[in-house]
């Protein structure tokens, strides 16, 4: 049954692969192949993720399935791969929030944009999109006259990502408002996802 599920997966017949894997789990929930069956369910969803410009329902399904693998089989090789794929899905979902936020920002709908960028900062902290989200918040706050909020957000950006180009941009914006912040370093450090996983310092 698992071989059938794998064969369907290899031929990209994801619905049949999912059905076969689910059938195996229902018949053998504690079987030796259960970890792989759950993993197969997850990667069937993961492989169907589309670009950030379209609906991300598949990303949500993939995230749920990947989290189930890591929760049920935390010491398995499948869990380790699922954890890496989870980071990728989170980055995808954050990318969608950023795309919508930028759209609102261009239209001058600053409160709607702020909500999207705040979601990235609070719910997707380990993703590559956080530095830009913080900078876009600075832009948005300045656009509606919230200088204090912009200053606080720029300070958070500078503390957590001092060498990023996004902080340099925010620093320039705040200088234009007469607000002093720590100067960015001359060297523009690249952003490394795995170096920055964890809580932001506010």
Please provide the spans of the model-predicted regions.
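Acidic, polar-rich low-complexity tracts and alpha-helical solenoid repeat scaffolds
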Residues: 1-202
